[in-house]
């Protein structure tokens, strides 16, 4: 059972919205998912990526492979989380 971390489209025309899911590699794009890990809203003004990083790390440790797009998004989410963690102590001091 090969698992992939990938995007499934749930938005409508001109309003894209994607779920970040763990799914069987051979299943359809919008087919059944094993678990929902977050959302990606490309047209949002704020942070377009919302991920549960604990669950992402769990599935990566279990052997799930991210698609190329998801690999880049996970890296971006990790960088933004690290930047927020550094900014929080500086703001409170």
UniProtKB/Swiss-Prot annotation:
Keywords, in A-Z order: Ribonucleoprotein, Ribosomal protein
GO annotation (BP), single: translation
One GO cellular component term: small ribosomal subunit
Top-level taxon of the source organism: Bacteria
Gene Ontology molecular function terms on file: structural constituent of ribosome
Family the UniProt entry places it in: Belongs to the bacterial ribosomal protein bS16 family.
NCBIfam families: S16 (TIGR00002)
The protein, known as: Small ribosomal subunit protein bS16
Organism: Opitutus terrae (strain DSM 11246 / JCM 15787 / PB90-1)
């Amino acid at each position: 059972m090969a698992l992939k971390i990938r995007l499934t489209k749930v938005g409508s025309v001109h309003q894209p919205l994607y779920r970040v899911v763990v799914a069987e590699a051979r299943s359809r794009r919008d087919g059944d998912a094993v678990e929902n890990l977050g959302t990606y809203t490309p047209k949002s003004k704020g942070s377009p990526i919302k991920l549960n990083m604990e669950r992402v790390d769990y599935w990566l440790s279990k052997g799930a492979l991210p698609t190329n797009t998801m690999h880049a998004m996970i890296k971006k989410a990790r960088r933004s989380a690290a930047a927020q963690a550094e900014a929080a102590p500086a703001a409170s001091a």
